[in-house]
Amino acid sequence: MMIKNKKKLLFLCLLVILIATAYISFVTGTIKLSFNDLITKFTTGNNEAVDSIIDLRLPRILIALMVGAMLAVSGALLQAALQNPLAEANIIGVSSGALIMRALCMLFIPQLYFYLPLLSFIGGLIPFLIIILLHSKFRFNAVSMILVGVALFVLLNGVLEILTQNPLMKIPQGLTMKIWSDVYILAVSALLGLILTLLLSPKLNLLNLDDIQARSIGFNIDRYRWLTGLLAVFLASATVAIVGQLAFLGIIVPHVVRKLVGGNYRVLIPFSTVIGAWLLLVADLLGRVIQPPLEIPANAILMIVGGPMLIYLICQSQRNRI
């Protein structure tokens, strides 16, 4: 009971930190706001500075929160579905497939912009299915599966490079220049994906069972692995439709959360949601304040942090095999 209460207290502390970070991000930037500016806005309704920030900065913050949460949860789900601690949507080519589909849709059917998360999901599904089919035939270990994923990532990025030579191919890059319609589109996918994940989370712990153990308790492990994988691909692909590829968030957060609260997915999923949202928000905030008025993309900061962590996890995986 004491451990459970400690986890609840930790979760509440993380929520407070997340809210505080969101506030700092809201008032920090080229146009700075004071607390009095906000009070004036909410009491009189007249403050042009706050109005401009609400239209320019608030959508960016909300999208950072949703994307961070979705990518972190997607990483945790992929690791559960593939039974691979190194799995992440960007590394295994899911994000690249989704981005190619996004580019094609914007060129040929731009009127379906509202459905981009769903259409990107179709693109992200292709590399995921290739990984699954190859794994079922060759039974890759964790590192070999990631190497196949990296090969797919390189291949698909080559295709993407060719496609983007066409100036009509609009590819989203990072969190800048986001508007309220982007928030609404992503919010639908975020709510749907995260709610389904919470409903599925009690079953995720059973994915660690082998086939014989699963059958003995009447658990259809293959069905739930597929459901978990599809949900992970959907969450990652939906973010790609709005902000493009963001690396390593799906690896960093689940492993940090496991160190904090253990591997129980009922606890891991909510914590990953909050920490993922916070981490991307911090990366975006740092990118805005390190070298103003220039902005460093949040993806660059994530890559600097995530690259060494991936190397560490690969070394740890190899050490466990010895």
From Swiss-Prot:
It comes from the Bacteria. InterPro entries: ABC_BtuC-like (IPR037294), ABC_transptr_permease_BtuC (IPR000522). GO terms for biological process: siderophore-dependent iron import into cell. Its main location: membrane. The chain crosses the membrane at residues 9-29, 61-81, 89-109, 114-134, 143-163, 179-199, 233-253, 267-287, 294-314. It is found in: Cell membrane. GO terms for molecular function: transmembrane transporter activity. Part of the binding-protein-dependent transport system for heme-iron. Responsible for the translocation of the substrate across the membrane. Belongs to the binding-protein-dependent transport system permease family. FecCD subfamily. This is Probable heme-iron transport system permease protein IsdF. It comes from Staphylococcus aureus (strain MSSA476).
